[in-house]
């Protein structure tokens, strides 16, 4: 006999399947509702252009990568990484592994190569326990790693898009990003659930 679902997980499932973005994603054959978040960010911030090389961290199931390939065209390239498996997408070079593992990071950097990239984006999040004092530090660790990679591989003028959960360490992290980019915005896309602490920092114009 299966375990009874908790009230919170049952509520999440109910919200998930009644969510208009989930329904639209299913109708359009999209990987996830995250596609709509990035579409809204692109509409306001014009991050992606044809021919770009983009790094996608926390890529599975592929909503962001799926969106980006429509924006960067045949001459563009997406290098994606996730702990979870992801079905292939044309134009996406996917590496499955834990981004926190030095060997995985080295393999990812090898795929990036010597040329700088135009965008680093991260939708990474830890498995949430529901306890902010546990979840926020875990999430901040991931976004710090994403920022370190952005510093290493972004070309001058490049952009960084990162999901961050508001809480302890957020203001300090935002300050670090502002020191490296000429323009920094905080976005809460309509497709992001209102109850969620998540926001997206959109940083453009990586300084020399």
From Swiss-Prot:
<dbReference type="GO" id="GO:0008650">
    <property type="term" value="F:rRNA (uridine-2'-O-)-methyltransferase activity"/>
</dbReference>
<dbReference type="Pfam" id="PF01728">
    <property type="entry name" value="FtsJ"/>
</dbReference>
<feature type="binding site">
    <location>
        <position position="64"/>
    </location>
    <ligand>
        <name>S-adenosyl-L-methionine</name>
    </ligand>
</feature>
<comment type="function">
    <text>Specifically methylates the uridine in position 2552 of 23S rRNA at the 2'-O position of the ribose in the fully assembled 50S ribosomal subunit.</text>
</comment>
<keyword id="KW-0808">Transferase</keyword>
<keyword id="KW-0963">Cytoplasm</keyword>
<dbReference type="InterPro" id="IPR002877">
    <property type="entry name" value="RNA_MeTrfase_FtsJ_dom"/>
</dbReference>
<dbReference type="InterPro" id="IPR029063">
    <property type="entry name" value="SAM-dependent_MTases_sf"/>
</dbReference>
<dbReference type="InterPro" id="IPR004512">
    <property type="entry name" value="rRNA_MeTrfase_gammaproteobac"/>
</dbReference>
<feature type="binding site">
    <location>
        <position position="123"/>
    </location>
    <ligand>
        <name>S-adenosyl-L-methionine</name>
    </ligand>
</feature>
<dbReference type="GO" id="GO:0005737">
    <property type="term" value="C:cytoplasm"/>
</dbReference>
<feature type="active site" description="Proton acceptor">
    <location>
        <position position="163"/>
    </location>
</feature>
<keyword id="KW-0949">S-adenosyl-L-methionine</keyword>
<dbReference type="InterPro" id="IPR050082">
    <property type="entry name" value="RNA_methyltr_RlmE"/>
</dbReference>
<dbReference type="InterPro" id="IPR015507">
    <property type="entry name" value="rRNA-MeTfrase_E"/>
</dbReference>
<keyword id="KW-0698">rRNA processing</keyword>
<feature type="binding site">
    <location>
        <position position="62"/>
    </location>
    <ligand>
        <name>S-adenosyl-L-methionine</name>
    </ligand>
</feature>
<feature type="binding site">
    <location>
        <position position="98"/>
    </location>
    <ligand>
        <name>S-adenosyl-L-methionine</name>
    </ligand>
</feature>
<comment type="similarity">
    <text>Belongs to the class I-like SAM-binding methyltransferase superfamily. RNA methyltransferase RlmE family.</text>
</comment>
<feature type="binding site">
    <location>
        <position position="82"/>
    </location>
    <ligand>
        <name>S-adenosyl-L-methionine</name>
    </ligand>
</feature>
<protein>
    <recommendedName>
        <fullName>Ribosomal RNA large subunit methyltransferase E</fullName>
        <ecNumber>2.1.1.166</ecNumber>
    </recommendedName>
</protein>
<keyword id="KW-0489">Methyltransferase</keyword>
């Amino acid at each position: 006999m299966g375990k009874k679902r908790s009230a919170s997980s049952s509520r999440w499932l109910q919200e998930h399947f009644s969510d208009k973005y989930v329904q639209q994603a299913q109708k359009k054959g999209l990987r996830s509702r995250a596609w709509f978040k990035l579409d809204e960010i692109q509409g306001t911030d014009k991050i992606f252009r044809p021919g770009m090389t983009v790094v996608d961290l926390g890529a599975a199931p592929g909503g962001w990568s799926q969106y980006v390939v429509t924006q960067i065209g045949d001459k563009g390239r997406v290098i994606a990484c996730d702990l979870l498996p992801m079905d292939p997408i044309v134009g996406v070079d996917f590496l499955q592994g834990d981004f926190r593992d030095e060997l995985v990071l080295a393999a990812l950097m090898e795929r990036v190569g010597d040329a700088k990239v135009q965008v680093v984006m991260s939708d990474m999040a830890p498995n949430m326990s529901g306890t902010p004092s546990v979840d926020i530090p875990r999430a901040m660790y991931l976004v710090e790693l994403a920022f370190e990679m952005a510093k290493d591989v972004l070309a001058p003028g490049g952009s960084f898009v990162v999901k961050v959960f508001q809480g302890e360490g957020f203001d300090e992290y935002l300050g670090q990003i502002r020191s490296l980019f000429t323009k920094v915005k905080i976005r809460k896309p309509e497709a992001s659930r209102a109850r969620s602490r998540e926001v997206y920092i959109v940083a453009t114009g990586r300084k020399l």
